[in-house]
Amino acid sequence: MNKKLVLMGAGLLLTAATASAQKLVTGHVTDAQGQPVMGATVRVPGTKVITTTDANGNFKLSGVPASAKKLMVSYIGMNTATVSVAGNVQVVLKDNELGEAVVIGYGTAKKVGTVVGSVKKVGGSVVENKPATNVADALQGQVAGLNIANNSGDVGTTQNITINVRGVGSLSASSEPLIVVDGVPAGAAMLSMLGPSDIESITTLKDASATSIYGSRAANGVIYITTKKGRSNEKAQIHLSQNVGWSQLARSIGNPMSADELLDFQLENGIIYPQTYAYFKGHGANTDWQKHMFDNAAPLHTTDFSIRGGSEKTTYYVSASFLKQNGITYGSSVKRTTLRTNIETKAKDWLKFGIAQSIGFSENSANRFASTRSSNVNSPSTVAASWPRYWEPYSMKSTHQIWGTDSWGILFDPNYYVDAAPSKVENLVYNGTAFAEITPVKGLTLRSQLGLYAIGNRVKSVIMPSYAQLAGGGTGSAERQSVQSSSWTITNTAEYKFNVNDNNHFTLLVGQEGIKASYDEFTAQADGLLDDRLTNLSAGTVPAAASESNYKYEYLSFFGRADYDFKQKYYANFTVRSDASSRFGKSNRRAMFYSGGVMWDMMQEAFMRPASTWLTNLQLKASVGSTGNSSIGNYTHLSLSGNTQYGGEQASYYAQFPNSDLGWEKQIQTNVGLTASFFGKLTLDFNWYNRKTKNMLMSMPLPYTTGMSAMMKNVGEMTNRGVEVEINYDIVRTKDWYVNFHTTYSYNTNKIDKLFYGLDQWDDKGSLVSYMVGKGLNYYMPIFAGVDEQDGAPMWYKVGYSGEAGYTYNPETMTKDESQIESLYQDTGKKLFAPHHGGFGFQVSWKGLTLAADFSYVLGKYMVNNDYYLNTSSSVAAQGLNLDRDALQMWKKPGDHAILPAFKYNSQFDTHLLENSSFMRLKNLQLSYDLPTTWMQATRFFENIRITFTGRNLFTVTKFKGVDPEVDSSLTTGNYPATRQYTLGVDVTF
């Protein structure tokens, strides 16, 4: 009995001791203006005890150890505060100059709201939460003026994204923006090698005030990617993420006839004999080639791991990510591994240095018959829409043959073609930077940085000898390609910040930058392979053919920038840059670029104080400046020769005339902007811009007597003009609820101002485009007037006339003479570049449950649907291929109101193929749940666990009949379709 009493007493004492070892701490958090801060994080350093403030800025933190002396309070955009644990804690958080900072190129980052230029920052979470293999794809619709098109859903390719900022700035030089990763210029391949979870932010620089500091490479804007770094005075935080899912077709391909419909059509139009008709009818096959060619459950898997933290002087971020994804076509897949290390240390009060580097390796297997714009009969998209459904694969898979194709000389299963001609691409991409930063006196920062962007690419392609028809002659072939490229960048800057009294704040920056790049490519091929097991080049019985190419280019630049503000009310910014490029002749090698901008923060004015209860921010800004475009060939200014065979002997020929007058393409851009916030909930950004391209590089036609067809010259001028609108509205923001709506919209018009030879118009029938001074780039084609209801003949409008397609022939305005088709080309009025781009989305959160969606759209877009031509053409139908069900509406008898002419007429390349490809697409839909904080505290191990389910490209609204309306092309043929994806993920933070 005494023993039991002793044990009970000990238990009570232990319970009391435990209770006394923990306590409840309450407090209140405000900003410098005394406004409550909702969502601030309050934690006990070194423990898992954590909570957040409510809508009134109040918090209750339970389970605080009695030994705890300090609390850490943090919030995005504000300095972290460390306060004593005593009574009712009152915390005032001050703005952090770098918390909500944007990096606009060189020097220290700037606080949001003090940047004069037109820039937009997107947080890394936007990219991290979207299952895209290319980070640019996740930005669609997020930034006004940033237009992104995914041209292929093939995971076996890397260069499948088109990016433009504020329209297309050049017709011959590149219109791609400059991509910078942690201060190092990088190529588009880097976008497919970045781990989404490694990205801290992506900032788009759009106007001259923001981009002019980059000079000759920034004519088309700048996309600056900042990767995650460690945090000072924070213990290690470990993050692990696992995602699994599958991909499928985003939308059906075409509308092919069924087996019975096609057989009836072919019999009716004399394409097959009655006995053939009966033969296929009796067999009864109705193969769905789309299901045969595309996998609607192609698996994908990603794993991301990172650890970040830091001491008082050293910070670190280390990560690894792995992606494995199968394509929806047979034989296409990608495996990608990415490693990153970012380390910074403050060795002395005046010395800081660090490195940021990543290396990525990918192995891509591509379906060689699924290449974009391929009309190969074995292309998956072509098979899905064009192969007769009364064909079918043989049941004996060893034959690999397609039943019913005897008249075609026996066709094989397209998936066997992939096995017979495998192709593998290996990519190794490195991006790294090392810097040293010295602060010898207060306000002065000297920085030197060395960066390297390098790519190693290896391609291995084989045609197996076991497949005689594909290999030709019963032997195979092998091809190897190796590409190595590198770009070294060294940057030295001096930045000095100082104040003149308390009202005048200055930041002066001067710098120098040098870039040295090289490219080497080697290709070799051997024929005569005799054994599928021996596919090396040395196994070929025919001597290998080899080729090699290489080039180098260099830049040398000097630049400066001055920033000034008066009382943080009036801001001014001026930049200058001098660039020299080896891509131009000595007389035009160097160019100067300038910019200037001003901004007025009206809410700092005394007369605006009465409106401060509802108008929380109002800024006006304006800028003008110049940038350059040097994205042309490396030796375009030189005289080049080539070698060939003539009369059985080696001969030389002129490959390119000397072009010493070739100079810089310059752009002068004006921007006027307004930013306003209402009630601290609704934010509006508006920008108007005028982007003038001068000395535009154009491929100028030459007389054939010169022996050349064209020559690059600075002869053109072009203008892009537009507006951009961004709206963000926090509809509800309480302790438990958060409802947000956001939208972006941009309108851009393109106009030719000057052409070569003083011409007012230049027609390019081959490209279906007409260049007309005073107008934008429009499609140039015969205008389809419809089908004559009397005889089923196609009708076209005569030059100078236009209208809708109808059924009544008017000889004054129309013609039915197919022989005149070449003389009927005219301006269609349909724009080559869509003027309207945008996106919108919402987020609804209740406690830990969140539903978010993002849509993107393009309006006023047109593309020539060459697939529709192939699937409705009489000449193609005569070969026995399947047709679109629209062909059932061909004209048959007088009085028919048909959309296609009678079968006896050949289809022509006219506007009946020019389709409205405007679209709206649900890019991402995500449902996530964060487990309660109290659960995490109870474990004393986890900080957060989030479960997510995400859908990508869930539906598309469009009138376009082709494979995918998103493709950035004037003509579509056999494009690899977009994919819909579903992923389930778990994110754990320790």
Regions found by a protein language model. Give the residues of each.
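Glycine-centered tight-turn and secondary-structure capping sites
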Residues: 67, 671-673
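Transmembrane beta-strand segments that form the barrel wall of outer-membrane beta-barrel proteins
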Residues: 242, 320-326, 572-581, 622
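Residue-level signature of outer-membrane beta-barrel architecture
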Residues: 227, 309-311, 322, 341, ...
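Active-site phosphate-binding and catalytic loops of NTP-dependent enzymes
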Residues: 147-151, 212, 603-611, 934-938
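Outer-membrane beta-barrel "beta-signal"
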Residues: 595-599, 724-727, 925, 929, ...
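Short, small/polar-rich motifs associated with maturation and membrane association
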Residues: 1-340, 345-348, 352-360, 431, ...
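Glycine-rich, aromatic-lined ligand/substrate-binding cores of catalytic
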Residues: 831-864
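Surface-exposed loop/interface segments of Gram-negative outer-membrane beta-barrel transport/assembly proteins
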Residues: 113, 232-286, 327-332, 338-429, ...
